[in-house]
Amino acid sequence: SYIYKMRTAVFRMSCTYGTRQFGLEEQGWVAWFIIATLFNRPITIYGNGKQVRDMLYVDDLVDAFNSFLNSKLERGLFNIGGGPSNTISLLEFLDELEKLAGKRPKVKFADWRPSDQKVYISDTSKLENTLRWKAKTSVRDGIKKLFDWVKGNESYFSI
């Protein structure tokens, strides 16, 4: 990019979720938990469920991309996630799902896996300071948007 004078940015993304996500147990866990809850499928939680993640709604990710495109920066490397203000534990997420679905998700607990992180929160300060970007969608609002979309499109997920 430097040789050819191409504007380039790398965004290191974490836990992006949103409407039109077809989550699987091993990838896209936010959508997977919602799909599993609506279809009475079991959810396996490795560890105690207290692990914390920052969550980034897809619309906010697109806003970050556009912030770079509309800037005068030639290049950039940015961490992007929900940041400290958009965190949730797996147990808190299950509580949110119960409120939305009107039923408790079916959950089974298994042993921690060697690669499981107990806490992951992206440091988005460079992105915030350089591009004046900040995630706008709260975790709870984003979960509700995705839940409503999955519920409104259940035929996509039935087996």
Residue map of PLM features:
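Active-site-adjacent segment of SDR/Rossmann-fold oxidoreductases
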Residues: S1-T8, A36
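Glycine/proline-rich active-site loop of Rossmann-fold NAD(P)-dependent oxidoreductases
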Residues: M6, T16-W32, F39-R41, I45-Y46, ...
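C-terminal "lid/loop" region of Rossmann-like NAD(P)-dependent oxidoreductases
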Residues: N48, R75-N79, L91-L94, G102-V119, ...
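Conserved C-terminal active-site "lid" loop/helix of NAD(P)H-dependent oxidoreductases
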Residues: V58, L77, R113-K134, D141, ...
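Amphipathic terminal alpha-helices
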Residues: V139-I159
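Non-catalytic, hydrophobic alpha-helical segments
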Residues: L61, F65, I80, L90-F93, ...
